[in-house]
Amino acid sequence: MTYETLLERFLNYVKINTRSNPASTTTPSTKSQADFALTVLKPEMEAIGLQDIHYNPANGYLIGSLPANSSKLTRKIGFIAHMDTADFNAEGVAPQIIESYQGGEIKLGQSGYSLCPEDFPNLNQYLGQTLITTDGTTLLGADDKSGIAEIMTAIEFLVANPQIEHCDIKVAFGPDEEIGVGADKFDVNAFDVDFAYTIDGGPLGELQYETFSAAALELKVLGRNVHPGTAKNQMINALQLAMDFHSQLPVDDRPEKTDGYQGFYHLHSMSGTVEEAQASYIIRDFEDSSFEARKAFVTQLAEEMNSQLGAERVFVTVTDQYYNMKKVIEKDMTPVNLAKAVMEDLAIKPVIEPIRGGTDGSKISFMGIPTPNIFAGGENMHGRFEFVSLQTMEKAVDVILGIVQKA
């Protein structure tokens, strides 16, 4: 189905910079997210007919409700999307609209960058569709403003068509998903549902209830600096030790060499001097045993290096971030089976596969609300090559509407 307000709503959202900040200690991590919630989303929620709208400054969540209009539909279902965007320029987003894409190169404004099927063969799946791209200087923000727009559009449609019977619905728009802390303070008592869905997936048909289990690894290395001309048997180069540590991690256990259910170590920043060096990693895996083994391996590696050095110079701090929500959701597959049935009714092929990442649903599921993830449409997310299909967004709205009518 087509929804006349969907595209305009999405374009309005993405033009607002809501980039999160991992260095911040506030909630939300950036004021722009709270402003977006209070000055854009909250008035719109009121205008389209949501009730019991509340913004909680303690956790950054904006919540609203739409009561059931049928006694036959007894479930209470939630839909969740996040307001922040990833760690890439989000100031001055200028979307391009490519109507009826016919294939080939899409120039991204005057940036000198292009979307090419040779680099991004997923483009070939969108022939004839309306694509929204960046101008090459920013990300787009379809992750996850497409999800927000889809939820809003579905609610607007239900209120405008009261003859459509639906269950109790709650919606929540939250902060800081991209920096991994958005759901830490989620208030399950304020979100009284049987189960929920994050609308935060990628291409058409994605339906996910498995995520990585995740940990952060901080490496600190202490060296000893002396003049390089007289350094023999005296200098201890912290940068070299950090490189030695990294070189002992399995060479094939990296993001660029893994897929499916394979885990990895990912070095995402390194800095330092001869005197002191730091490196930051993320650790990811699906199975508990593999996840624990990865964490134990880096701890043991540091101990072995210190033993060889004869001093405590290599320090690792491992902090768990979130866990695979499969262990919660597989206890009752109702939310997955319901979404799957709705997709099949709509002739959408469900693509049920693990998320090689996490969602707010990872943490919310462990708080007691099973929360699988549904496609929102974004492709090539988190950078200048991000794009989304309007037709996929429309189908996401269709799925939301189907779920609340089938609950």
From Swiss-Prot:
Cofactor entry: Zn(2+)
Active-site residue list: D84, E177
Enzyme class, broadest EC rank: hydrolase
Superkingdom classification of source: Bacteria
Catalytic activity: Release of the N-terminal residue from a tripeptide
Keyword set includes Zinc: yes
GO annotation, biological process: peptide catabolic process; proteolysis
An annotated Gene Ontology molecular function: metallopeptidase activity
Annotated compartments: Cytoplasm
InterPro entries assigned: ArgE/DapE_CS, Bact_exopeptidase_dim_dom, Peptidase_M20, Peptidase_M20_dimer, Peptidase_M20B
Main location: cytoplasm
GO cellular component, one term: cytosol
Name of protein: Peptidase T
